[in-house]
């Protein structure tokens, strides 16, 4: 669960992110620059703008923390609007005047969970009758990082495996006994926005054990594991966010070394 992939280039405007700007734009010749036009990846990695996602995301985060703005410089991209019509529509929708200066404002953001519910090669979990596929599942095919578009192949392969496995089950095994549990009076939940803010601070691209421990201490004051008799969809979503954030934090603390998308902040 500690392996959360951050994409380096999300379209950003006034501190908000609006969508992903594909690495194909850099592959077509775009460069990552700061507000002064400096090539920010030039001294970071031999592959510069085409370095692995985790390396680029960490480098851009360091630039932001140093007070810089980051842009994709499109001057060397041929026929950008023709080759990237959907990205052009996204930029136009948010009224970013990239045609005037050939610059797209970007920043890193959370993108993909390499971890998830542990499954075998058929998509089965440790709970009989429960299957997981796609980003919710941890099939092991991504390891500590993920190559672009491999998640699509994962979904194609494992959805077929899951469907075949379920189809081959005897009819009597296709129903499960409901899980009995004591119902709580109500959830004790944090404000969703506060949870997201604290989780982002503790579980961001480069992490600190102290900040993760502080986050877990804060999270421990809430009871989000006891299902009440009555709850709203928003409450259930927030409770699930708490569970996922707790799992990521605990897994991150257990992983002492830097590996792939999981990296400790240098002191």
Task: List each model region and its residues.
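Short secondary-structure transition/capping segments
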Residues: 10-16, 111-113, 144
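Glycine- and aromatic-enriched mobile tails/lids
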Residues: 38-42, 49, 59, 112, ...
């Amino acid at each position: 669960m500690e392996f959360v992939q951050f994409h380096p280039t999300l379209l950003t405007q006034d501190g908000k992110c609006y969508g992903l700007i594909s690495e194909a734009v850099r592959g077509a010749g775009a460069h990552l620059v700061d507000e002064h036009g400096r090539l920010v990846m030039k001294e970071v990695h031999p592959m510069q703008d085409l370095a692995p996602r985790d390396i680029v995301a960490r480098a851009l985060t360091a630039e932001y923390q140093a007070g810089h703005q980051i842009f994709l410089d499109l001057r060397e991209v041929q026929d950008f609007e023709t080759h990237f019509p959907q990205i052009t529509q996204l930029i136009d929708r948010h009224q970013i005047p990239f045609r005037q200066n050939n610059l797209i404002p970007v920043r890193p953001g959370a993108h993909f969970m390499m971890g998830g519910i542990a499954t075998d090669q058929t998509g089965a979990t440790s709970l009989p009758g429960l299957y997981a596929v796609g980003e919710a599942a941890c099939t092991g095919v991504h390891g500590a990082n993920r190559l672009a578009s491999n998640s699509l192949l994962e979904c194609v392969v494992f959805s077929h495996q899951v469907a075949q496995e379920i189809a081959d089950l005897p009819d009597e095994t296709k129903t499960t006994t409901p899980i009995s549990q004591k119902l709580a009076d109500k959830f004790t939940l944090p404000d969703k926005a506060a949870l997201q803010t604290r989780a982002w601070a503790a579980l961001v691209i480069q992490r600190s054990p102290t900040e993760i421990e502080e986050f877990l201490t804060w999270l421990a004051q809430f009871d989000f594991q006891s299902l009440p008799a009555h709850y709203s969809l928003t409450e259930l979503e927030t409770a699930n966010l708490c569970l996922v954030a707790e799992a990521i934090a605990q897994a991150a603390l257990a992983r002492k070394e830097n590996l792939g998308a999981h990296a400790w902040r240098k002191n």
